[in-house]
């Protein structure tokens, strides 16, 4: 588990670690252990049996950073680079509170992607999935870009993160369901590709 906590001027990519506690407890309740990775600048997690706040242990090292990503059952990541470690070693990942949206295309079909919500500040309405995957909004990466377009960023809440965690756990426990999910993921990508081809008038 890696939860990005950067400087205050980088709030676009940050997440509140406390909104992950319900998911952590879900994993532990199913017999798993959760290793929270990162560095000592991060917020300390509450003491929970089965949760290892790894950055604050004597075992913290670059080797262990890679080892944990390589040997985990799956990884939970945010808008930071660590999630690429488990992916490199063929492990599935759940990305939550993620921006930019179009990074979804860098994932394989067995992974789950839950981007941050984007709302129109003028109307108060959520921006549709179709618009999220357009080539302008989908590549926004800084607060100014969102502000200039009257877009508010809303983090996933703890229940959304928990529901996604339950989903990936169930997928890992049920091979048939995982095959169905992979097919749905491919179909979704095809639909978005067709939509963007209409906009740009060339194959994506």
What positions do the PLM features span?
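Well-ordered, non-membrane alpha-helical segments in soluble/globular domains
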Residues: 15-22, 69, 162-163
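Aromatic-acidic/polar surface patches that form glycan- and anion
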Residues: 13-16, 61, 154, 158
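Leloir-type glycosyltransferase catalytic cores
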Residues: 109-204
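Intrinsically disordered or highly flexible coil/loop and linker segments, enriched in small
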Residues: 33, 81, 174-178
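Catalytic donor nucleotide-activated moiety binding site of glycosyltransferases and closely related
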Residues: 1-7, 17-61, 180-191
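Surface-exposed cleft-lining segments at the edges of enzyme active sites
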Residues: 8-12
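A donor-sugar binding/catalytic signature common to diverse glycosyltransferases
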Residues: 65-111
């Amino acid at each position: 588990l890696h939860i990005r906590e950067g400087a205050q001027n980088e709030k676009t990519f940050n997440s509140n670690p406390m909104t992950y506690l319900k998911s952590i407890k879900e994993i532990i309740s199913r017999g798993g252990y959760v290793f929270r990775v990162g560095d000592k600048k991060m917020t300390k997690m509450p003491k929970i049996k089965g949760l290892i706040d790894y950055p604050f242990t004597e075992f913290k090292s670059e080797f262990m950073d890679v080892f944990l990503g390589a040997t985990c059952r799956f990884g939970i990541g945010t808008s930071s680079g660590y999630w690429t470690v488990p992916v490199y070693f063929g492990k599935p990942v759940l990305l939550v509170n993620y921006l930019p949206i179009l990074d979804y295309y860098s994932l394989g079909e067995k992974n789950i992607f839950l981007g941050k919500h984007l709302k129109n500040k003028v109307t108060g309405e959520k921006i549709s999935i179709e618009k999220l995957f357009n080539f302008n909004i989908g590549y926004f990466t800084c607060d100014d870009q969102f502000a200039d377009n009257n877009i508010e960023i809303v983090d996933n809440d703890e229940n959304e993160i928990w529901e996604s965690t339950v989903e990936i756990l169930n997928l890992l426990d049920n091979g048939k369901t995982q095959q169905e999910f992979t097919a749905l993921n491919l179909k979704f990508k095809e639909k978005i590709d067709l939509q963007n081809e209409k906009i740009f008038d060339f194959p994506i």
